[in-house]
């Protein structure tokens, strides 16, 4: 579903109102803080009365209202003008008013790569204990008939669960079981903004929790899919599919349609999920950059209330590539970047001179014989520039020149639709595509004709062959799945990057996990992105959408082992046990040229589920710590009172954000010497000593006091100081290092990021 279609319906919906009132209404969320109320009818009445104060009448208020939030926090959403929204923001019971923006979805072997078998081998009870953990998934729904959601061997639904199985199109009570224990759907917000879903042409959808997109099915099965053997995509990545926590339960919240998720619908889903009693909440979605302020963003607000209730919220960092584009960056959200695993999908090219070029693709189609090669630039349509044709854009290629040939195209920019190029070639009579993509080390795509992507080394060989051969030919081979490739992991080229645009002292993203070429369950009616648009039950896709459920699953495993741990403790355990080394014992890289990745790419590093179960030391923080953090970022006492339901005063000297007890250490404006403080809690059993070691950021002297921490029993807390003394400016860039505590058994590592403004 294209954004242009959605935009056209939005314009049609509001044009009449604009003519009458002279001001276009927009969809706003009116957030009123932590005042949940069991009597939803009284809340609705109160919301209508508040809304009527700006609309002029109760009837107009009822017509404008879309969602009412009352289960876990209070508020509503409504179609109102910017002027009316401004008036509501001044109401004494309102924390904030912000426009409901559109979020986007951040679109087997990975668990072996992470060593998850070791977790279950060393902890045989893990599968049983995980069955009491409930993971809420806010996404595009679920395909319940997938074998990944069978409930063989699972016990009764946990008594703590208060959710529902909501029926609808092609979805009955029988579609829920002891694996999918709850399912809801939300579309009011999106329909208020774009009109009825039925108006979206050429799109299959179900007005129910059933997934027509595939994305939600994929993420849910990655988290908690049951073990299913002999799974593949057209023979690729063949093996056993499973979720990271295959005994965990799933509660599905469908808030995304056609790849878009209205803030107001996501907020409603979070309101329900918190009330339903989920333990982990997974969101593979987020806003386009720039990231909205914390309390002008539905995900940040909803996640704060989840954090208060002991629910960890794991969310994808986004696929926006560039610096300062990471989303979902509130410190109470676990922000997940994407990285590769040690598996490649090779679709090589056999040239007419018998040389073989390395290509990457998800290409199951066998090409019979060899075909002529032609550059797209040499096949430009009449009146079109060769440059445009080299990118194989629509209407730029001459069908008479490409018919029966393999066309060599070039990626113009990172955001190019690579699949579309193959469609254009097929429509013109071409039989294959070689796509020059200098980032061709990551994502495997599916195409409608035999196609493969090549990087710089292969490009040079191909160009040399094309220059010397009068009638060049080639064959594109079907994909072979190679396991054990090196180096891995690498930061995914598409993964959004820090620094945190709102609070740069808080390093974001937090962690990275497998997000490239991940095989998981799929909706068989979602055929738009598959080879020749064929129906499949399992699919391979990439994105931070795929890495997020890996972290959600590992969080669920830790929660099952340590039910009393706070969300912050679970985050800390995963972050401080992460690795920054690949399988060649080198630092994790970012691109094919060997550029090293930084904490702005991978946060604290690549997740290590085995080590995260026994972290040794934890950087914990509470809801009160978050409130102190908000004070340092300008929150008023009135906002805090509405937020928490209690009178909360900010300290006269609020704690600086670089002293927030986060597992990473960031200072975005280092002017001369500075002391930063952290407190660790001992999560071991026996007396032990930890010793500090520092990887020093360039141009900065670092001293840790005390440099030795002695613990006698579990639960002990010790505060230490890190003194930074810069002797060289960093010229507007961050310099990185790390602090590690080590007791000979556990290493507790925190990345350091400093922007040195003056010495």
From Swiss-Prot:
UniProt record, GO biological process: arbuscular mycorrhizal association; proteolysis; response to symbiotic bacterium; response to symbiotic fungus
Subcellular location: Secreted, Extracellular space, Apoplast
UniProt keyword annotations, A-Z: Apoplast, Glycoprotein, Hydrolase, Protease, Secreted, Serine protease, Signal
Glycosylated residue positions: 170, 230, 388, 593, 642, 671
Entry EC number(s): 3.4.21.-
Name under which the protein is recorded: Subtilisin-like serine-protease S
Domain Inhibitor I9: 28-105
GO CC, alphabetical: apoplast; extracellular space
Peptidase S8 domain span: 110-613
Pfam families on file: fn3_6, Inhibitor_I9, PA, Peptidase_S8
Induction comment: Rapidly induced in roots during development of arbuscular mycorrhiza (AM) upon colonization by AM fungus (e.g. Glomeromycota intraradices). Up-regulated transiently during root nodule symbiosis with Mesorhizobium loti.
InterPro entries tied to this protein: PA_domain, Peptidase_S8/S53_dom, Peptidase_S8/S53_dom_sf, Peptidase_S8_Ser-AS, Peptidase_S8_subtilisin-rel, Peptidases_S8_3, S8pro/Inhibitor_I9, S8pro/Inhibitor_I9_sf
Principal localisation: secreted
Family as reported in the entry's similarity comment: Belongs to the peptidase S8 family.
Class of enzymatic activity (EC top level): hydrolase
PROSITE patterns tied to this protein: SUBTILASE (PS51892), SUBTILASE_SER (PS00138)
Gene Ontology MF term list: serine-type endopeptidase activity
Signal peptide: 1-22
Role of this protein: Required for arbuscular mycorrhiza (AM) development during AM symbiosis with AM fungi (e.g. Glomeromycota intraradices).
Catalytic residues (UniProt): 139 (charge relay system), 215 (charge relay system), 545 (charge relay system)
Residues covered by the PA domain: 390-462
PANTHER family reported for this sequence: PROPROTEIN CONVERTASE SUBTILISIN/KEXIN
């Amino acid at each position: 579903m294209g954004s242009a279609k959605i935009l056209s319906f939005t314009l049609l919906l509001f044009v009449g109102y604009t003519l009458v009132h002279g001001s276009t209404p927009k969809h706003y969320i009116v957030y009123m803080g932590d005042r949940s109320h069991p009597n939803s009818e009284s809340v609705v009445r109160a919301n209508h009365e508040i809304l009527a104060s700006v609309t002029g009448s109760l009837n107009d208020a009822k017509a404008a209202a879309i969602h009412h939030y009352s289960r876990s926090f209070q508020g509503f959403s409504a179609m109102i003008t910017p002027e009316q929204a401004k008036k509501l923001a001044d109401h004494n019971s309102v924390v904030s008013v912000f426009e409901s923006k559109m979020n986007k979805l951040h679109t087997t072997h990975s668990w072996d790569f992470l060593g998850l078998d070791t977790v279950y081998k060393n902890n045989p009870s893990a599968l049983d204990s995980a069955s009491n953990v409930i993971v809420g998934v806010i996404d595009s729904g679920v395909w319940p008939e997938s074998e990944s959601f069978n409930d063989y061997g699972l016990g009764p639904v946990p008594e703590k669960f208060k959710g529902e199985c909501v029926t609808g199109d092609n979805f009955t009570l029988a579609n829920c079981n002891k694996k999918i224990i709850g399912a809801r759907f939300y579309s009011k917000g999106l329909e208020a903004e774009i009109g009825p879903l039925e108006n979206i042409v050429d799109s299959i959808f179900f007005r129910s929790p059933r997934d027509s997109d595939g994305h939600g099915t994929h993420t849910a099965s990655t988290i908690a899919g049951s073990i299913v053997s002999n799974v593949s995509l057209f023979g690729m990545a063949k093996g056993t599919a499973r979720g990271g926590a295959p005994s965990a339960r799933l509660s599905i919240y469908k808030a995304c349609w056609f790849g878009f998720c209205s803030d107001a619908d996501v907020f409603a889903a979070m309101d329900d999920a918190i009330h339903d009693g989920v333990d982990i909440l997974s969101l593979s979605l987020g806003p386009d950059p720039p990231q909205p302020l914390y309390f002008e963003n539905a995900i940040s607000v909803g996640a704060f209330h989840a954090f208060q209730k002991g629910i960890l919220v794991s969310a994808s960092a986004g696929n926006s590539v560039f610096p300062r584009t990471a989303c979902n960056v509130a410190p109470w959200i676990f922000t997940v970047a994407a990285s590769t695993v040690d598996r490649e999908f090779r679709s090589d090219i056999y040239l007419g001179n018998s040389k073989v070029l390395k290509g990457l693709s998800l290409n199951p189609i066998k090409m019979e014989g060899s075909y002529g090669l032609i550059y797209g630039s040499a096949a430009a349509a009449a009146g079109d520039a060769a440059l445009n044709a080299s990118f194989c854009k629509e209407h730029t290629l001459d069908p008479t020149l490409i018919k029966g040939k393999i066309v060599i195209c070039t990626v113009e920019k990172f955001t190019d639709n690579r699949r579309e190029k193959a469609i254009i070639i097929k429509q013109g009579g071409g039989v294959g595509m070689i796509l020059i993509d200098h980032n061709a080390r990551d994502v495997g795509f599916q195409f409608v004709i035999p196609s493969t992507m090549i990087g710089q080394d292969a490009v040079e060989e191909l160009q040399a062959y094309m220059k010397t051969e009068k009638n060049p030919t080639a064959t594109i081979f079907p994909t072979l799945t190679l396991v054990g490739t090196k180096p891995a992991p690498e930061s995914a080229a598409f993964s959004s990057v820090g620094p945190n645009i709102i609070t740069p002292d808080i390093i974001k993203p937090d962690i990275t996990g497998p997000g490239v070429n991940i095989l998981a369950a799929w909706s068989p009616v979602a055929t738009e992105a598959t080879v020749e648009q064929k129906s499949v039950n399992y699919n391979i896709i990439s994105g931070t959408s795929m890495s997020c459920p890996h972290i959600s699953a590992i969080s669920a495993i830790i929660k099952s082992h340590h039910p009393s741990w706070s969300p912050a403790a679970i985050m800390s355990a995963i972050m401080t046990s992460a690795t920054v080394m690949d399988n060649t014992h080198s630092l994790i890289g970012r691109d094919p040229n060997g550029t090293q990745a930084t904490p702005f790419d991978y946060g604290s590093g690549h997740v290590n589920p085995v080590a995260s179960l026994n972290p040794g030391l934890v950087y914990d923080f509470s809801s009160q710590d978050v409130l102190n953090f908000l004070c340092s970022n300008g929150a008023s006492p009135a906002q805090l009172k509405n937020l928490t339901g209690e009178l909360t005063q900010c300290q006269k000297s609020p704690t600086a954000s670089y002293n927030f007890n986060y597992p990473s250490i960031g200072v975005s404006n280092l002017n001369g010497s500075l002391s930063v403080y952290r407190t660790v809690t001992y999560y071991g059993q026996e007396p032990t000593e930890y010793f500090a070691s520092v990887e020093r950021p360039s141009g900065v002297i670092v001293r840790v006091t005390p440099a030795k921490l002695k613990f006698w029993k579990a639960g002990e807390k010790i505060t230490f100081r890190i003194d930074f003394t810069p002797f060289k400016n960093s010229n507007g860039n961050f310099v990185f290092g790390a602090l590690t505590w080590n007791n000979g058994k556990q290493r507790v590592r925190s990345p350091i990021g400093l922007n040195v403004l003056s010495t």
